[in-house]
A protein has these predicted regions:
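N-terminal helix-loop segment corresponding to the beta1-alpha1 unit
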Residues: 1-170, 174-180, 356, 362-386
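Terminal low-complexity tails and localization/encapsulation signals of metabolic enzymes
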Residues: 1-8, 231-233, 315-386
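Glycine-rich beta-alpha junction loops
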Residues: 117-118, 191-196, 234-236, 242-247, ...
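Conserved Rossmann-fold dehydrogenase catalytic segment
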Residues: 119, 148-158, 179-195, 215-222, ...
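Oxidoreductase and adenylate-handling cofactor-binding alpha/beta cores
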Residues: 137, 163-185, 197-208, 250-259
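Flexible glycine/proline-enriched surface loops and loop-helix/loop-strand junctions
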Residues: 149-158, 231-236, 346-349
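Aromatic-enriched alpha-helical interface/lid elements that frame and gate functional surfaces
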Residues: 226-303, 307
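Conserved PLP cofactor-binding pocket of PLP-dependent enzymes
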Residues: 301-322
């Protein structure tokens, strides 16, 4: 029984950040029902979809272009604590399931709207993807190496960090407030806003005069030799994050950088003298190229260098640290990340494998709305659900 056990959530099916929010809530015990399009219903329940982003919740197939289908969603709203939708601004209203209609049915509902640009603004009604949202937020400009083009971070910043994860935080905040006030509200969760929020520390560094807009020249963006990745003798990589003086001293001791420089007749410059960072990166690159990744693990693991091997997804799932912690689990025959964060008394858990669209229509109508078989059959016959 996770910490959100007893909470009921409607997820109007979408892609990316919305499903991630719903997955996080379901992992923590919420009863999440995904409203899928009726015309996409079907699939062999014995062969669940491989998209584990859809794990943990039931699916109801609904025709939102029919009045009866819309009424089904509004009936569900009466029993829900929260609703998540990811349409462009105005679409939910045109369908008849916008905030006004839903809050009229359930004044305590937390209604969360996930978009890239937000509900208003010059870009609000235009298409976009993660790369565009983090570009406008000022985040993408700082990802990549000096002299090279910005590098998209595989949708982690916009869709999932600044999008789905912050929306989940917003929904839980809304639920807590609704418990106190008895009133619901609308959440405008925009990926451009969330991505900007994730940049707060960098804005602080900029205000402090220790960060510039020149990509790849700052301490945390591959500008510094002591905070970077290095190729090893076998073509693999290791990561180094030796920022603090005591950690940097460990890096020097275990890498032999100082001796490497002395052999060339060079002295070791002050760590924070940025004018030497590029030169020292080249020297460290030579050092790390002398051993394989596993050999460097033997040298540095267990120390205070701030070191870790750069692993592929497959390697990460097998690493002893992750295995001991259960960071990854096999569920439904698919290896995937385990629910996070961890609770000592009410831990989260993957509740079920992903459902095909409409796989649980009858079950949801009976469970949430108390319908009998004839009522369910009538809705199916009308085409309102599938």
């Amino acid at each position: 029984m996770g910490p959100l056990s007893g909470v009921k959530v409607i997820e109007v099916a979408g892609i990316g950040p919305g499903p991630f929010t719903a997955m996080m809530l379901a992992d923590m015990g919420a009863d999440v029902v995904r409203v899928d399009r009726a015309d996409r219903a079907g699939g062999d329940p014995e062969v669940p979809p491989a998209d584990v982003l859809y794990r943990g919740r039931r699916s109801l197939g609904v025709n939102l272009k029919s009045d009866e289908g819309v009424q089904v969603v509004l009936d569900l709203v009466e029993h829900a604590d929260a609703l998540i939708e990811g349409f462009r601004p105005g679409v939910a209203e045109r369908l008849g399931i916008g905030p006004e209609e839903c809050l009229e049915r359930n004044p305590a509902l937390v209604y969360s709207r996930m978009t890239g640009w937000g509900q208003e603004g010059p870009y609000a009604h235009t298409a976009g993807h993660d790369i565009n949202y983090i570009a406008l937020a000022g985040a993408l400009a700082h990802l990549g190496r000096a002299g090279e083009q910005p590098t998209p971070p595989i949708n982690l910043v916009g869709d999932f960090g600044g999008g789905g994860m912050l929306q989940a935080f917003g929904v839980v905040c809304g639920l807590l407030e609704a418990q106190r006030s008895g009133e619901g509200q609308v959440i405008d969760a925009a990926m451009v806003d969330g991505s900007a929020t994730l940049m707060t520390m960098i804005w602080a560094f900029r205000a402090m005069g220790i960060w510039t807009d020149e990509r790849g020249t700052n301490m945390l963006d591959t500008g510094a030799h002591f905070y970077d990745t290095y190729e090893t003798a076998d073509g693999k990589y290791v990561s180094i994050g030796s920022i603090e003086p005591q950690f940097y001293a460990e890096l020097l001791r275990l890498s032999g950088l100082e001796e490497h420089l002395a052999a060339k007749g060079k002295e070791l410059p002050y760590q924070m003298d940025a004018s030497h960072w590029e030169e020292l990166r080249g020297e460290l690159a030579e050092v790390f190229a002398t051993k394989t990744r596993d050999e460097w693990c033997e040298v540095m693991e267990g120390s205070d260098v701030c070191f870790a091997p750069v692993l592929t997804m497959e390697e990460a799932a097998r690493h002893p640290h992750n295995v001991e912690r259960g960071t990854f689990v096999e569920f439904g025959g698919i290896t995937q990340p385990a629910p996070s964060p961890r609770f000592s008394r009410t831990p989260g858990a993957i509740q079920r494998v992903p459902a095909h669209p409409g796989q649980d229509t009858d079950d949801v109508l009976v469970d949430w709305l108390g319908m009998d078989d004839s009522g369910v059959a009538a809705l199916r016959d009308s085409g309102a659900v599938a």
